[in-house]
């Protein structure tokens, strides 16, 4: 990978894209607290039907995002990443307005699918920063950038719930659209990119993209790692509140306690991601990745044996601290092992695997808990992460980019 052009102020771009990721993360999570209520308002009734439709409108966005991501990644490699940020923010803003005007569940489902097709602000922001930042600061920069989306996702549900209580459900969609339009304007004026458009006939096809990689098997293993990270995170989500109730018994503030336990991993990730990313720049992101995967296994197993919500909350905080380092480490390794020419597609493929994990994780958690109980979910998830840690270690041991070579490249880029 070549060093970033000197005329591009990557630090300013990092700040602006961090703010954009924060606004995008907040916009997406603003509507999450009342999504089932909006489904009910659109005419769906009955416990079983409400659960089914709520699950559909939630998962269809990730499904269509996984389908569309490679196309947008290819277009980003042809036209540039900034235009993809603008396209995503504007497109999602328009869809949010239409969601606020939906009259039935089928319209809403179609718009949720369209939201997935037009999304992609955060992965394109990752690709933009990864191709501009000096290599010896990649881990810190991508770790810092990841905190933007996490921060937005943490604060979004709180604000969304307050807005829905005070103004109703539909106005929240219009407020969300306004946030996304603000993100569009900010990106338009303040993000800078030097990019020479590539003719379609000069673009590498999918086979050529992988042939151009230093280690295609390593890249594929990193895609799988991204998917399993999301599976591990998502598998716990469907059972968390019920597991807290099993631990705490009948308490009057179950929703508050569950919400706190659901939020603490994000807080931990905010603290750990930049620091572990910076450490990865010194000792290598591959060491951070393997260490955090192994630590995740050691944290997941005790979760199956906790006796109180406090114990679960402490372990969830520790798990969040490890998770905060995983995706930035994967992204840093991706950019170490591909060129700027194909970075957009590599990051988009990674996003597709992430979306597959977002869909399959809750399904795995629900299936395991239905058959074997809540505690079994943590054991199964630990086994999945352990397999991934061993597989990743094997692939990283075979990669051609050794620490000495990386140190030389870092000195050249800095």
From Swiss-Prot:
It comes from the Bacteria. CDD domains: MFS_MdtG_MDR_like. GO terms for molecular function: transmembrane transporter activity. It is a multi-pass membrane protein. The keyword Nucleus does not apply. The chain crosses the membrane at residues 14-34, 56-76, 89-109, 113-133, 144-164, 171-191, 219-239, 254-274, 288-308, 376-396. Its main location: membrane. GO terms for cellular component: plasma membrane. It is found in: Cell inner membrane. The keyword Transport applies. Keywords: Cell inner membrane, Cell membrane, Membrane, Transmembrane, Transmembrane helix, Transport. InterPro entries: MFS (IPR011701), MFS_dom (IPR020846), MFS_MdtG_subfamily (IPR050497), MFS_sugar_transport-like (IPR005828), MFS_trans_sf (IPR036259), Mutidrug-R_MdtG (IPR023692), Tet-R_TetA/multi-R_MdtG-like (IPR001958). Signal peptide: none annotated. Belongs to the major facilitator superfamily. DHA1 family. MdtG (TC 2.A.1.2.20) subfamily. This is Multidrug resistance protein MdtG. The lineage of its organism: Bacteria, Pseudomonadati, Pseudomonadota, Gammaproteobacteria, Enterobacterales.
């Amino acid at each position: 990978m070549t060093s970033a052009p000197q005329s591009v102020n990557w630090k300013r771009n990092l700040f602006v894209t961090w703010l954009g990721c924060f606004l995008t993360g907040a916009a997406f999570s603003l509507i999450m607290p009342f999504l089932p209520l909006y489904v009910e308002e659109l005419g769906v009734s009955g416990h079983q039907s409400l659960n089914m439709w709520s699950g559909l409108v939630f998962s269809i966005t990730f499904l269509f995002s996984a389908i569309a991501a490679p196309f947008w990644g290819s277009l980003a490699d042809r036209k540039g990443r900034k235009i993809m940020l603008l396209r995503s923010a504007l497109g999602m803003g328009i869809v949010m307005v239409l969601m606020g005007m939906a009259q039935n569940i089928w319209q809403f489902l179609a718009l949720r699918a369209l939201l997935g097709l037009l999304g992609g602000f955060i992965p394109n922001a990752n690709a933009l920063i990864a191709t501009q930042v000096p290599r010896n600061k990649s881990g810190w920069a991508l770790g810092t950038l990841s905190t933007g989306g996490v921060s937005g996702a943490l604060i979004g549900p709180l604000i969304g719930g307050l807005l829905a209580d005070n103004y109703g459900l539909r106005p929240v969609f219009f407020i969300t659209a306004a946030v996304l339009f603000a993100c569009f304007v900010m990106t338009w004026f303040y993000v800078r990119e030097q990019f020479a458009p590539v003719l379609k006939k000069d673009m590498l096809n999918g086979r050529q993209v992988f042939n151009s990689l230093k280690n295609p098997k390593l890249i594929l293993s990193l895609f799988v790692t991204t998917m399993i990270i999301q599976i591990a995170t998502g598998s716990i989500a469907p059972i968390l509140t019920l597991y807290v109730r099993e631990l705490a018994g009948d308490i009057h503030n179950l929703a508050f306690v569950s919400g706190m336990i659901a939020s603490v991993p994000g807080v931990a990730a905010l603290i750990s991601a930049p620091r572990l990313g910076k450490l990865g720049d010194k000792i290598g992101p591959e060491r951070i990745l393997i260490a955090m995967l192994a630590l995740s296994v050691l944290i997941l197993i005790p979760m199956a044996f906790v006796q109180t919500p406090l114990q679960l909350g402490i372990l969830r905080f520790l798990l969040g601290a490890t998770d905060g380092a995983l995706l930035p480490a994967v992204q840093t390794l991706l950019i170490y092992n591909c060129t700027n020419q194909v970075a957009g597609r590599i990051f988009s493929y990674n996003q597709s695997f992430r979306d597959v994990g977002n869909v399959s994780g809750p399904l795995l958690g629900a299936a395991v808990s239905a058959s074997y109980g809540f505690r079994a979910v943590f054991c199964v998830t630990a086994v999945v992460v352990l397999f991934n840690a061993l597989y990743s270690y094997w692939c990283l041991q075979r990669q051609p980019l050794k620490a000495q070579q990386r140190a030389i490249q870092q000195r050249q880029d800095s």
